[in-house]
């Protein structure tokens, strides 16, 4: 009753589809990422023409943020990297992976994608341990950088690297995403992307 507008936070494809299908006549703001298994165009196609005029989509510039990550790697001369992708049903994970693939290729960075089913540090830790062992068995050098789709994953990879005696950043660089609380107090501090969540909130409330 007496609702002026609806604000939908839709980190996953299922949530995005539900927000688009919602039968509301009030203005709706959908906070989401640009890429996913359901495209923005497909989602908007679920909204009637009349209601579409009262619908706004807002989100963080994930591509711009990833471009800064790739530029930083290029600045330090990295030519190879492991990319820890988030769960594919999350639109942020899908968008960041798409951005990473295209932008890394544009900088001629050889990229190995490590697919994770969760955002958990423990899963990234297990994957990193496996990769270190696998590269060791082959007598191959690890890529010179790790890029993670969120900071939890980056923390997991850092633990595995430390336990195998690899120094950060002397032996391998690690970059996270989201600037989670506490990562600046790690040793060494985690290099991470700081999304403008405050700006996103302001944009959504406009």
Mark where each language-model region is.
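A short acidic, amphipathic alpha-helical/loop segment
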Residues: 15-21, 99, 156-160
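Hydrophobic alpha-helical segments within soluble ligand-binding/sensing domains
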Residues: 36-83, 94, 98, 121-132, ...
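Amphipathic helical "hinge" segments at domain boundaries
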Residues: 1-9, 98-101, 105
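Short loop/turn motifs at secondary-structure junctions
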Residues: 2-3, 77-80, 110, 142, ...
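C-terminal regulatory
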Residues: 105-147
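Flexible loop/hinge segments that line or gate small-molecule binding clefts
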Residues: 11-65, 152, 178-190
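Flexible loop/turn connectors
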Residues: 55, 129, 133-206
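Periplasmic-binding protein-like
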Residues: 2-11, 30-32, 82-85, 114-115, ...
């Amino acid at each position: 009753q007496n609702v002026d507008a609806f604000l939908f936070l839709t980190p996953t494809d299922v949530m995005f589809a539900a927000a688009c299908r919602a039968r509301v006549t009030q203005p709706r703001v959908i906070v989401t990422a640009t890429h996913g298994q359901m495209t923005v165009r497909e989602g908007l196609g679920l909204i009637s023409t009349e209601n579409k005029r009262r619908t706004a989509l807002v989100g963080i510039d994930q591509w711009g943020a990833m471009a800064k990550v790739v530029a930083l790697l290029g600045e330090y001369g990295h030519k190879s990297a492991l990319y820890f992708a988030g769960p594919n049903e999350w639109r942020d994970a899908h968008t960041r992976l798409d951005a990473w693939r295209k932008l890394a290729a544009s900088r001629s960075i050889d990229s190995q994608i490590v697919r994770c089913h969760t955002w958990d540090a423990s899963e990234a830790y297990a994957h990193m341990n496996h990769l270190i062992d696998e590269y060791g068995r082959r007598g191959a050098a690890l890529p010179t950088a790790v890029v993670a789709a969120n900071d939890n994953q980056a923390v997991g990879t850092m633990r595995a690297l430390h336990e195998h005696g690899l120094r950060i950043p002397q032996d391998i660089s690690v970059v996270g995403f989201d600037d989670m609380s506490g990562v600046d107090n790690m040793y060494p501090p985690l290099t991470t992307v700081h999304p403008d969540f405050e700006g996103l909130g302001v944009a959504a409330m406009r």
